[in-house]
């Protein structure tokens, strides 16, 4: 370690990998002035936009996506892995990395293998309730294994939550509520339902909630609905005096959206659950019906603390909204109980915790190397 600590973040590909990495980067910069931070990615991932926007250095390697079925890609995989590991080892040497923090995904796998070869200590963070292949490999030789939940399939883990950007973790919903509702055109005393399906929206959520628009309006419920830039949303013509149904392709100010809302209907990806619970917002989670049920598992902790409900995508309907969501939104006592349960499940300090662990690991490794000499 040459005076300042150098950290390599391996979390490229999707927002679910990049956003926790950037939250930890911000925490590292706040905790350790002068820390050198480098993100590892590929030209295909969202990191090519998100990392430079946050002001951090980005190094690109050959992508190593794991094929989901037998194909020519499977035969080329060993060659791609070797090339990506070689490239990553060169980057580790160039930046004089003291520690690698991996967040899973196809960027993390070569990072773990390269770090092991270069004898750079590894910290693994798993955001999902069911760990992927990369983190299963990395956990075998990591110094510390951190997780959002207690049993992601990585053996012994330290539960720290999922790192979330500070604009969310520092949000005071009650203090910002009046400003947030004015921003979207809602009354101060409105009951507001927030609907979103991630950065791309969710068609089934769109169809169901828009189909329940009349029932929501009849109950006096305002709606803030982010339907996704690639989707369209059809709504009935409002009747005179109906509360607003604000439909937008994308919400650039999720902090204001969370502050304005009393309840959310959303998917249960790891980052969504982390943000919604960090701000203490009650939610109806609709797991994406793909994979091995990871999204249902992601929502389990907040459901167990009483901060949310889970409904299968196939069971979500306009009738469900009318029969379950409307009564919930009009029950002040139940909303207050769910708010407390959501906050109990959330981890506002996850990014700082991961950053502290990584800095400790880097210092311990540096001390060990000095001792060997």
UniProtKB/Swiss-Prot annotation:
Reaction(s) catalysed by this chain's protein: di-trans,octa-cis-undecaprenyl diphospho-N-acetyl-alpha-D-muramoyl-L-alanyl-D-glutamyl-meso-2,6-diaminopimeloyl-D-alanyl-D-alanine + UDP-N-acetyl-alpha-D-glucosamine = di-trans,octa-cis-undecaprenyl diphospho-[N-acetyl-alpha-D-glucosaminyl-(1->4)]-N-acetyl-alpha-D-muramoyl-L-alanyl-D-glutamyl-meso-2,6-diaminopimeloyl-D-alanyl-D-alanine + UDP + H(+)
Alphabetical list of Pfam families matching this protein: Glyco_tran_28_C, Glyco_transf_28
Membrane topology designation: Peripheral membrane protein
Keywords: Cell cycle, Cell division, Cell membrane, Cell shape, Cell wall biogenesis/degradation, Glycosyltransferase, Membrane, Peptidoglycan synthesis, Transferase
EC class (word): transferase
Protein name: UDP-N-acetylglucosamine--N-acetylmuramyl-(pentapeptide) pyrophosphoryl-undecaprenol N-acetylglucosamine transferase
UniProt gene name: murG
Subcellular localization(s) per the UniProt record: Cell membrane
Pathway in which the depicted protein is active: Cell wall biogenesis; peptidoglycan biosynthesis
């Amino acid at each position: 370690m040459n005076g300042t600590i150098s950290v390599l973040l391996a979390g490229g590909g999707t927002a679910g990998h990049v956003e926790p990495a950037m939250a930890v980067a911000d925490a590292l910069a706040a905790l350790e002035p002068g820390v050198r931070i480098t993100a590892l990615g590929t030209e295909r991932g969202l990191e090519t936009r998100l990392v430079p926007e946050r002001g951090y250095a980005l190094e690109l390697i050959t992508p190593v996506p794991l094929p989901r079925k037998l194909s020519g890609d499977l035969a080329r995989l060993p060659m791609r892995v070797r090339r990506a590991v070689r490239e990553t080892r060169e980057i580790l040497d160039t930046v004089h990395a003291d520690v690698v923090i991996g967040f899973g995904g196809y960027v993390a796998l070569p990072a773990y293998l390269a770090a092991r070869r270069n004898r750079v200590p590894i910290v693994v963070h798993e955001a999902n309730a069911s760990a992927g292949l990369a983190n299963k490999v990395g956990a075998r030789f990591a110094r510390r294994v951190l997780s959002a939940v207690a049993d992601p399939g990585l053996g012994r883990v330290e539960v720290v939550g999922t790192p979330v950007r500070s604009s969310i973790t520092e949000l005071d919903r009650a203090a910002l509520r009046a400003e947030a509702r004015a921003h979207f055109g809602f009354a101060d005393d409105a009951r507001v339902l927030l609907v979103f399906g991630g950065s791309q929206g969710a068609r089934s959520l769109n169809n169901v909630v828009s189909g329940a628009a009349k029932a929501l309006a009849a109950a006096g419920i305002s709606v803030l609905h982010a339907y996704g830039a690639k989707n369209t949303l059809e709504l009935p013509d409002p009747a005179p005096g109906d509360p607003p149904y604000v439909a937008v392709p994308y919400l650039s100010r999720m902090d204001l959206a969370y502050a304005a809302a009393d309840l959310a209907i959303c998917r249960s990806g790891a980052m969504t659950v982390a943000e919604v619970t960090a701000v203490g917002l009650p939610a109806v989670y609709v797991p994406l019906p793909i994979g091995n049920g990871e999204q249902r598992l992601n929502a389990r902790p907040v459901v167990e603390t009483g901060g949310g409900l889970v409904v299968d995508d196939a069971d979500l309907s306009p009738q469900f909204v009318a029969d379950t969501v409307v009564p919930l939104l009009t029950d002040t006592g139940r909303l207050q109980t769910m708010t407390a349960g959501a906050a109990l499940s959330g981890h506002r300090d996850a990014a700082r915790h991961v950053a502290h662990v990584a800095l400790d690991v880097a210092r311990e490794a540096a001390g060990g190397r000095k001792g060997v000499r």
